[in-house]
Amino acid sequence: MGQTKSKIKSKYASYLSFIKILLKRGGVKVSTKNLIKLFQIIEQFCPWFPEQGTLDLKDWKRIGKELKQAGRKGNIIPLTVWNDWAIIKAALEPFQTEEDSVSVSDAPGSCIIDCNENTRKKSQKETESLHCEYVAEPVMAQSTQNVDYNQLQEVIYPETLKLEGKVPELVGPSESKPRGTSRLPAGQVPVTLQPQTQVKENKTQPPVAYQYWPPAELQYRPPLESQYGYPGMPPAPQGRAPYPQPPTRRLNPTAPPSRRGSELHEIIDKSRKEGDTEAWQFPVTLEPMPPGEGAQEGEPPTVEARYKSFSIKMLKDMKEGVKQYGPNSPYMRTLLDSIAHGHRLIPYDWEILAKSSLSPSQFLQFKTWWIDGVQEQVRRNRAANPPVNIDADQLLGIGQNWSTISQQALMQNEAIEQVRAICLRAWEKIQDPGSTCPSFNTVRQGSKEPYPDFVARLQDVAQKSIAIEKARKVIVELMAYENPNPECQSAIKPLKGKVPAGSDVISEYVKACDGMGGAMHKAMLMAQAITGVVLGGQVRTFGGKCYNCGQIGHLKKNCPVLNKQNITIQATTTGREPPDLCPRCKKGKHWASQCRSKFDKNGQPLSGNEQRGQPQAPQQTGAFPIQPFVPHGFQGQQPPLSQVFQGISQLPQYNNCPPPQAAVQQ
């Protein structure tokens, strides 16, 4: 490791010396050990880095990118390396010009002499460029032990000394006295350039802040108090302020003047700072005009209408949203509503917005519903008391008086609001390709569908089908009560007609159905079925009438009168004494007519009916009728089969027992 450090130190000796001088002059102290560690990492991951070093800021930015890539791959890069890299990159930024910086080796050998001559002949900008190109040549070309320190001081610090001479208040306390371009005395030679000497640094003096100035056109110039009307704003500095100068109020000096600040101005300034200036352009803006001569107090100020077209970014967002989500998706409705209410849109703007965002078939639907809405609005304007002087040509942006943009820009606020409402309503009626609008009667809640989703579908269908808002609200409330699944319907049934005045019925229904279908709800339903207690804590009651006592709220089998006073009621109603042991089952005191036992006290089954008739003999029937065999020649002489069976039945019947007469004789 020691050999590697010594190798790095000898390889980049000149460049290391220059970097240390540059950083020390900027008020930053970096140890040689940390710089050697930095160049070890650079040599490991950036083999393209030149041995003679470079002053090109692009090369150091490239080093940072490659070190980040190495860190992502798992290589360990010390924190000091990142700190030193950032410090060196920041120190090289003032030396960059519009042209690419050259490598150190490309500078001519006589640059030290030519540099001083050129700086006296050229302007300040050209001087800085030449200084950036040739500043490192004396350090790189020779060893630090052979450098003329007086000449090196003049080469490295000419512009810094000039700036210090112009702005002495920006220099630290130790160097508050302006200095010219004279050479350094022998005692003030930088420590890093003194050969084989060790000088103890004075740590009591604070380091000089490293400051630099951008070109004049890039500097921020705060607005004057008289221009923007901010009483607490400090006056602008007389000289060149250090970069960057943080703004106090407004972020855009080129914005139009305003007499008082507002939140809208701050938002617009922030968007302009971020680069999104087109998003805040209003199609039509009304700017107050200065009062003319003879204007009386109390008169409304005269305004001037100015039109600006939509930004390409806004139209692109609308087109992508319609293509990806659909014209009536929640995202598109919110975006369209914000554009409509945040801008003063004229009919021409609505047409451009629809043409650029919708497909041809969707635009045809939008135009159709637009015309239909205009006709309805014109009828309302004529029926109003007093009539509203807004015709169909104005709402559509057609005709001789309203066909141009300049004419539409002068529309009244009431006409703008009517156009907005009509176009938003027409946009909502646009149907996606291949989809049909179902009837609100057919919208029903699924068995596992959440109640809010069902209501959202119902509202969407009703909004496309019913034009009148009051009728749409009544239909939605009715269908939200009639068409949910049985679980939600049982939850909202107690709220029918009991919602307080001023409360939203749909919101109350949604609250009542909150959590329906979940695991907790199913567990509560099971507990309800077991205990008879509903979710609200009330006992479930039967709505019918008891057939025993005539009261409402229970069945006959659960009648408390029947269960408690059954015997007394039977005795008083029948007029008989209480029954004794049942003669049928022998195991209960009740009447035999009321016995419902299927087994007696011994476990023997009991028949359902006590008295039965005698069992009848089974009648055996054959599959085919019996036909006796008769020869072919005796068919006419054979008697019918019925006569044969009748004769057989008249014969005496004998069995194993002798007749009674024979038994007596024996």
From Swiss-Prot:
Myristoylation is essential for retroviral assembly. Alteration of the glycine residue leads to a block in the budding of particles and an accumulation of Gag inside the cell. Specific enzymatic cleavages may yield mature proteins. Its main location: membrane. Residues 604-622 have a biased composition (Polar residues). GO terms for cellular component: plasma membrane. One of its GO terms (biological process) is viral translational frameshifting. Residues 232-247 have a biased composition (Pro residues). Disulfide bonds: none annotated. InterPro entries: B_retro_matrix (IPR003322), B_retro_matrix_sf (IPR038124), Gag_p24_C (IPR045345), Primate_lentivir_Gag_pol-like (IPR050195), Retrov_capsid_C (IPR008916), Retrov_capsid_N (IPR008919), Retrovr_matrix (IPR010999), Znf_CCHC (IPR001878). SMART domains: ZnF_C2HC (SM00343). Pfam families: Gag_p10, Gag_p24, Gag_p24_C, zf-CCHC, zf-CCHC_5. Residues 170-189, 223-264, 598-640 are annotated as: Disordered. It comes from the Eukaryota. Keywords: Cell membrane, ERV, Lipoprotein, Membrane, Metal-binding, Myristate, Repeat, Transposable element, Zinc, Zinc-finger. Insertional polymorphism. Provirus present in 29% of tested individuals. The products of the Gag polyproteins of infectious retroviruses perform highly complex orchestrated tasks during the assembly, budding, maturation, and infection stages of the viral replication cycle. During viral assembly, the proteins form membrane associations and self-associations that ultimately result in budding of an immature virion from the infected cell. Gag precursors also function during viral assembly to selectively bind and package two plus strands of genomic RNA. Endogenous Gag proteins may have kept, lost or modified their original function during evolution. This is Endogenous retrovirus group K member 113 Gag polyprotein. It comes from Homo sapiens (Human). The gene is HERVK_113.
